[in-house]
Amino acid sequence: MKRSSTIFLQVVIVLIGLGALALLLWEPHIEGRNAHSTLVQTYFHDPFLAYAYIASIAFFVVLYQTFKVLGYVRQDKVFSQEVVRALRTIKVCAIAIIGFVAGAEIFITLSNSDDRSGGVFMGVLITFGAVVIATAAAMFERILENAVAVKSENDLTV
């Protein structure tokens, strides 16, 4: 992969992270029920918001690990144990995101709100994306583990 392509992808990853962080910090202020609340009321009295912030940690870890993998690609270290570890972390975080979204879906279903369809639909979309990412990361992890093993065997033979 060209150096400019990996740098472009790393910039995209950083922009996605900044956009997600801005949304996490800005969205509670424009939500209807928090329009006239103080900062303390907005951020510390909503358990669902705290849950969303805790769940977002896994998302940001995935972004960081993806950034690291792209750095290894740029350095031509694709077939290394570091990439395998980063892919394993991405897989575990994607599974954690699935668990967090499932917990949020249960919370939405059990709450006494009138309109649950939007939240449930967003949860299904996020779960689908996380399943795809976890599956792809597991597949690439397995392929790279085998490639690293073959490479280490070839390095030992003279």
Where does each model-flagged region fall?
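Membrane-cytosol interface motif
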Residues: 78-89, 151-158
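Alpha-helical transmembrane segments and their immediate juxtamembrane interface regions
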Residues: 121-152
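Alpha-helical transmembrane segments of multi-pass membrane proteins
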Residues: 18-31, 134
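Membrane-helix boundary elements
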Residues: 37-63
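Non-cytosolic membrane-interface motifs at loop->transmembrane helix junctions
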Residues: 39-42, 116-125
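Alpha-helical transmembrane segments and their helix-start/interface "positive-inside/aromatic belt" motifs
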Residues: 1-17
